[in-house]
Amino acid sequence: MKKNLSSTIVLNKIPEQFYRPRTAVDRSEITRCEKITTEIFPKVEEGAKLIANTIEAEIKAAQTAGRECVLGLGTGQSLTPVFEELIRRHEEGLSFANVVVFNAYEYFPLKVGSKNSSLHKLHELFLDKVDIKACNIFSPDGTIGQDNVQAHCRTYEQKIADKGGLDIIVLGIGRMGNIATNEPGSTLTSTSRIILTDAISREEMTMSFGSQEPVPPCTLTMGVATILKAKKIFLTAWGDEKASIIEKTVEGPITDTIPATFLQTHNDATVVIDLAAAAKLTRIVRPWLVTNCEWTDKLTRSAVVWLCLKTGKPILKLTNKDYNDNGLSELLALYGSGYNVNIKIFNDLQHTITGWPGGKPNADDTYRPERANPFPKRVIVFSPHPDDDVISMGGTIRRLVQQGHDVHIAYETSGNIAVGDEEVTRFMHFINGFNQLFINNSDETIKKMYADIKTFLAAKKPGDMDTAAIRTIKGLIRRGEARTACTFNGIPLDHVHFLDLPFYESGKIEKLPMGERDVNIVRDLLLQIKPQQIFVAGDLADPHGTHRKCTDAVLAALDLEKEDKAAWLKDCRVWMYRGAWAEWEIENIEMCVPMSPEELRAKRNSILKHSSQMESAPFLGNDERLFWQRSEDRNHDTAKLYHDLGLACYEAMEAFVEYVP
């Protein structure tokens, strides 16, 4: 069973020479915009091996010379593949007996013995699985008294110096360009110190904690100057959620608002990333500016859209001069003229727009994104949480229902962890009041549960896991909201399916691994309905990873059906939606469904049915907008982009990309 098929989704096939240049001359050409040595790999494991190779070589060189190898290590998620590779090498015989490790940062203040310390996590991930001596492990002490912090940081700095400085330091990067926990505003000369973490950093750290326990407000961190004294620096990042900050770090100016840019001043710093994290580097996203290109349809569309945005012109007004002045003369040679390129791309984009997301019956579908037949279609919309369906494609769902298709909504997880305690209190007050008013307070189960839950919530401390009963009630609240939204959109309640995939039910932010039980639940639904059209979440960068695991479960089930040569699958198309956390890039859009002002208002109303996910929802991310506002803004932006390119002007649009099993 293939459990990570989402990682194989490649929207744009990047030519190998863009990330693995054949010669030094080629590398010099394609990296001309990059100010730090950057190594890009198609797979995370390959990048981890590069770092592990360097560390292994340094360890062995130190062993030969009879000295210690001094490492600085962070504990971000991006370092986990590196630790796994080093552990594998240890199991094959690599000794870490001569290795000294300095932890890059620690939370402050901490209680003695806290299992949420950065050092505890480093032990779990790496130190306890290799033969590093306990006396060779150093870390800032998060339990130290506040009056002694400055002296402690100076001592930590001196310990690094006494060991001869760091031979290699391996760090991740925060969304704001943090290295270790040096926040925006950190100076080039800063040394080990206490620092107040901002809200975005604390949110990232909360995910590492694996619970809702508040992250301590401060950290004790190596300073920028401390890091830059290392002989060799590795900065790692994986996944498209890091693409923007990597582009600013590697290609942008040095600025204290992005501390990672200080690495540009080091003579042996290397950024190690995968293709997803490299997605916004010039050589990947705008290769025509640095080298010759093989002009695929998608790359041509991307270049023309970029040219329109740069010149402020719609597609059909671009001239030969525009192409020549902006490094796109190759397209003129390929197509004969700018006019020919313009017509092709305009038509390509025009053909993505459809008011018939399920296909228009009895119509020529040659240039339509979805086929006309069969009609009506059996449709399943898979929604990771009980509101992702309406947030991401609420307008399309209403259109499918209104046009007569047999629409089913499958809510993959309970979403219970995203319900606030006050919602439970409100519903328990209602149930208790109902018991008193209508059944003479005679239901002893209700009375006991009301008392137990009231007592538990009153005594609940940050980080305490909800009881099974409370999680069930929170799940019921979300089920009720989902049913209300489905009814509003015209979907019969017997077409609403709550899958409650087991991987989600950890009771914590950190979920269980997606497994065979999850896949079988999805597969059973597919075999029951045998859909001719499927919609799945392509919004794989959600903060807690639920979307990716849910989509992986669907793709794994489809893959099993494909292996079994299921007849129904031959007549089925799979579409990926986004909207809750991101939107599709226009070069990848294959179907775009427009909405009128009235339809957009109906979509908003369907999102608002999920009342527990409004202002009081625990996990709104670092975006201050509510989900309906984010959704509308993205839909407005997509419509505006189409209009700016010279296509029809709509109020809003929802975009989709096809997945081929």
PLM regions with names:
Residues 82-92, 390-414, 418:
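Histidine-anchored nucleotide/phosphate-binding helix
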Residues 180-224:
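Class I SAM-dependent methyltransferase SAM-binding "motif I" and its flanking Rossmann-like core
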Residues 175-197, 250-253, 548-557, 590-595:
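Short, surface-exposed, charged loop/turn segments at secondary-structure junctions
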Residues 2-70, 365-366, 373:
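N-terminal glycine-/serine-/threonine-rich phosphate-binding loop
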